[in-house]
Every structure is written in structure tokens, then in C-alpha cells.
């Protein structure tokens, strides 16, 4: 009988390892492209396309392959908006240095054509719920930004305010994606626009989500100027008839509240250039004059003149005559040296 040679089905370990390494590289990169393509479909007004991935020689490592992802097409175009160009450059840089963020940065920044498109996408994904879909919110924000271009102008001013005043911030990208004070103000601006359009139930729904997600409670009837920074933001409460003028800095735990049950004009009016320290409570329809400074933990019950510093419970004037905008320098302690701290 003719013998038949038997061959082992076992494959040498070194061959298996080599084969697996070759097979794992391109699929890993392609998986990133697939994820980006899926997320891209959520972005409004972005043409249908796939993420092009540069062909990587097999000798290169998987990490090198990820770092060589090439995003092509007409998203994130160069335009006259310097802030948008900067955001795109920062996003590309972070995607290259940290490939794990490539998918996230593509869906939030690089898949979009403008600041307003990216902002609408970020806010929609932050504020969505099981019964309020991100696609609904994306349409809502996008329509409001197209209808009122001042919303985008104010967003840029707020972004620049954070960059100028917060030493912990070194990229515009951080502000848009990670700073909830900035995000809360931008979402409030859309809620306020809806309120002015007499779409009050929708405005209140949006305000409720802002409060739940960001822990910032701003009534949609409140008026917020541009160049405003909510630093840390947690616990900020701003009532319906409050007015916050331009270039104001507000730290966490601040309340601009009313008193009693009167339903008229009952909330504080904050002048331009004011800085309000952490934990401050300002009650009633009173004016805090421009370029004033309210020390942390103070309770303000009376009007504060312009260019003044007030501290304490209840707050009292400790300095008058400061002309520089303290909101820009974030200086909360100068002018307090002469106080008697003895108890």
C-alpha cells in the first residue's frame, strides 16, 4: 500500500506571530477610518465621503500607521476666520501626537467646515438625551447660527476671553471641546434666541439640559454680553431679568438672584469689565458698576459704584478709583492690603 505522508497542522510560532503582525496593521488603521466615516455622517452639511488613509508599508509599525492618517476632502477648509483655522491646526496636531484622539477630533472639528458647524455638533452631543436626540439638537443649533450670525461672533469673543484670562488654557481647541463654562454660555445664547422668538417651551427645555449637564443655571430670559468668561462655572445661577455686560469674568458658585415674589425686573445688572469672585451672591435689581471687583464669598445687597472693590457679608466698599478692567487681569486681591484682618 502506498504510504501517504502526514503533515502537521501546526504552524511554527514565529510564522504565526509574523503573519498576525502583518494582518493587524492595516485593519487597525482601516478600523479608524470606518469609525470616522460613521461619526462623520452625523455632521450636517458635510459631503458623504470616506476618510482616506495613506498606504503604509508593512515594515512600519501600527503606531506609525495611525500617525500617518491623511484627512482629505473639503472639510475644515482654509477661510478668513483665523479662529477656525487655528482650531483646525490644533486638532490636526493633537490627532498626530495622540492617535487615540483621531476619531474624536475628526468628528468634533475636522469633519466640519466652520466654527458654527463644529460648535453646533459639540453642543448637540453634550446636551442630547434618550428623548432629545443629538440629530434634533444639531438641526436646532445649526438653524439658529445661520439665522443670527451674532451668536458666532459672540462665541469667538468668549473664546478669546478665556484664552486671554485663563493661564491654565493654552489652546483654543481646549476651550471649544473641554471648557464647560464656554459651552454653557454658547448653549444659553441659543436658548435666549429661542426665548426672544417666543419659543419658550423649547428654550426652557434647553435651559434644563444645560443645568443638568453643565451645572450652570442661566434663565433663557437673561441677557449676557460678549467676551464673558465663566471660569470653572459649576454652581453659577443667573436669573431671568439679570444683565451681564461685555468683558465680565465670573467664577464658580456665583448667584445673580432676585428677592421676594415680585415678577418684574428683579435681578442684578453687572457692568462691563467686572470680575466676580467665587461664591459671590448678588441679590435684587441692583447695579454693579463697570470695572468693579467683588471679592470671593461676598454677599452684595446694595449698588456698587464704578471702579470699586467690595468684599464681605454684607459687602462693603474697600476701595474706589480702580480704572483698569479687573475682569481682564483676573486680579481679585489688589487693593485689599490695608484691610484689618484681626478677628
Regions flagged by a language model, labelled:
Residues 271, 306, 316-317, 323, ...:
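Alpha-helical subdomain
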Residues 211-318:
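Structural signal for interior beta-strand "rungs" in well-ordered beta-sheet cores
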Residues 2-209, 325-343:
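Terminal amphipathic alpha-helical/low-complexity segments used for targeting or macromolecular assembly
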Amino acid at each position: 500500500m502506498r504510504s501517504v505522508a502526514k503533515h502537521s497542522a501546526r504552524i511554527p510560532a514565529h510564522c504565526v506571530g509574523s503573519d498576525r503582525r502583518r494582518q493587524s496593521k492595516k485593519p487597525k488603521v482601516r478600523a479608524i477610518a470606518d469609525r470616522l466615516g460613521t461619526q462623520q455622517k452625523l455632521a450636517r452639511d458635510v459631503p458623504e465621503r470616506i476618510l482616506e488613509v495613506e498606504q503604509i508599508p508593512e515594515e512600519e509599525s501600527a503606531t506609525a500607521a495611525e500617525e500617518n492618517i491623511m484627512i482629505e476632502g473639503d472639510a475644515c477648509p482654509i477661510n478668513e476666520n483665523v479662529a477656525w483655522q487655528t482650531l483646525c491646526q490644533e486638532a490636526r496636531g493633537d490627532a498626530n501626537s495622540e492617535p487615540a484622539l483621531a476619531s474624536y477630533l475628526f468628528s468634533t472639528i475636522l469633519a466640519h467646515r466652520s466654527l458654527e458647524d463644529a460648535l453646533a455638533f459639540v453642543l448637540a452631543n453634550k446636551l442630547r438625551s434618550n428623548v432629545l436626540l443629538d440629530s434634533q439638537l444639531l438641526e436646532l443649533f445649526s438653524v439658529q447660527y445661520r439665522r443670527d450670525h451674532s451668536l458666532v461672533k459672540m462665541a469667538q469673543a468668549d473664546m478669546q476671553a478665556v484664552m486671554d484670562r485663563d493661564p491654565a488654557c493654552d489652546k483654543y481647541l481646549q476651550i471649544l471641546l473641554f471648557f464647560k463654562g464656554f459651552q454653557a454660555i454658547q448653549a444659553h445664547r441659543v436658548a435666549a434666541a429661542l426665548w426672544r422668538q417666543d419659543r419658550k417651551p423649547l428654550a426652557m427645555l434647553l435651559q434644563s439640559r444645560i443645568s443638568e449637564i453643565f451645572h450652570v443655571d442661566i434663565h433663557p430670559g437673561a441677557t449676557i454680553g460678549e467676551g464673558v468668561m465663566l471660569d470653572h462655572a459649576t454652581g453659577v445661577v443667573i436669573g431671568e431679568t439679570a444683565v451681564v455686560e461685555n468683558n465680565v469674568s465670573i467664577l464658580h458658585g456665583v448667584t445673580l438672584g432676585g428677592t421676594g415674589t415680585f415678577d418684574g425686573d428683579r435681578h442684578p445688572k453687572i457692568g462691563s469689565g467686572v470680575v466676580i469672585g467665587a461664591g459671590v451672591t448678588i441679590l435684587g435689581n441692583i447695579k454693579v458698576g463697570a470695572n468693579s471687583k467683588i471679592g470671593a464669598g461676598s454677599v452684595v445687597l446694595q449698588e456698587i459704584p464704578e471702579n470699586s472693590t467690595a468684599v464681605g457679608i454684607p459687602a462693603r466698599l474697600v476701595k474706589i478709583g480702580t480704572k483698569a478692567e479687573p475682569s481682564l487681569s483676573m486680579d481679585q486681591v489688589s487693593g485689599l492690603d490695608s484691610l484689618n484682618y484681626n478677628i
